[in-house]
């Protein structure tokens, strides 16, 4: 394969998952969208695939991704899996509107899946129509770019394709497709499917496939299956620590939405907190608050326990219990490590006093409805002078508690060997100027429904460069408008 191609069909394709037994999936062709057109594509993702961003033909991208032309990827497939949804096992899951088109084999021999969301009905669609709407597609397309740019592990999206086709969701809505790119589409629920059917040979075959493709370094371990589970646990702990440190609420942490490689996967009613609220629920359908912001670490452990249950035919129970027992410490180390970075205090290590400083700050955030990300960005500019902390009053952080916290923070800074300039530089690289808030997405979606896609393209530029101030984007660094709090999100997509 050449180092830079100008067409998707010029890439080198494979589909290793399709070489597994046919009951692992269903072969199905995508259903073309009516009058498909390209809304936006992510040049960085294109280059990761080996495409030349400057030579890509928008009409060709729309044709291939909208179903008007066949990609030479082999036969596209819908994967079968199961999962626990809101704590209840559901055996009747699978790719109900998405198709795994195949794997791009890059010049450096990496494998990246291409998965088309909104591609039409499959055997696993149940009562769904197999489509995705423009609203949810814009959200996934933009947030995947935002998360990757923040350094939070996430799937990517090559392009967003719109259409003149409509379907019923919140009223009649236009259909769209997103071409998702990630090394892995294996969910916790893939393993649950075979376990609960008692198909232990297939369970072993799936685990062997995952170790060979995603964790080849574990093949020589004493128990490769336990080593794989430990790696999934480690990555999951790190991922959720990243979420909590940036105030990200996934919204639907079902086991079928959990990736075994620790990526944020299957975006739905997600939210970045405008004000810090541990009890915040981003999904209106989550009436019990199972997936509230503060619950996410515990739910991650619950989901890992469900995966452990599914792996019992391969791993001794006591080994799995010991592995799960280590999750809390792994998560805490990752979370406090990330928060220490955000405070510019990494050189001290997350010792007891620093952890207490972080805990107390989060308590103050919750008590004062503080905008966590705006606070941390402003704190990055602390230059040793009291005046550089005046932003606390502007952010309603002028309580006695904040004054006491400020004094303790300054003491930590003063005891460090790191210069203020170096600390500021480091903090500005982990505390974003811009975070992708729901109101920003809502504005772009409203315009897109009127046929104006420029706001989507502008937001993509902003969220791909979140740590640097950008001309014309000043308002996105300010407090969200009052109406932002009334935005209602559900699982509808």
Curated annotation (Swiss-Prot):
Mg(2+) binds at residues 257, 266. GO terms for molecular function: AMPylase activity; ATP binding; magnesium ion binding. ATP binds at residues 94, 96-97, 117, 129-130, 180, 187, 266. The active site is at residue 256. Keywords: ATP-binding, Magnesium, Manganese, Metal-binding, Nucleotide-binding, Nucleotidyltransferase, Transferase. It comes from the Bacteria. InterPro entries: SelO. Its cofactor is Mg(2+); Mn(2+). The keyword Transferase applies. It is an enzyme of class 2 (transferase). Its EC number is 2.7.7.-, 2.7.7.108. It catalyses: L-seryl-[protein] + ATP = 3-O-(5'-adenylyl)-L-seryl-[protein] + diphosphate; L-threonyl-[protein] + ATP = 3-O-(5'-adenylyl)-L-threonyl-[protein] + diphosphate; L-tyrosyl-[protein] + ATP = O-(5'-adenylyl)-L-tyrosyl-[protein] + diphosphate; L-histidyl-[protein] + UTP = N(tele)-(5'-uridylyl)-L-histidyl-[protein] + diphosphate. The keyword Transferase applies. Belongs to the SELO family. Nucleotidyltransferase involved in the post-translational modification of proteins. It can catalyze the addition of adenosine monophosphate (AMP) or uridine monophosphate (UMP) to a protein, resulting in modifications known as AMPylation and UMPylation. HAMAP family: YdiU_SelO (MF_00692). This is Protein nucleotidyltransferase YdiU. The gene is ydiU.
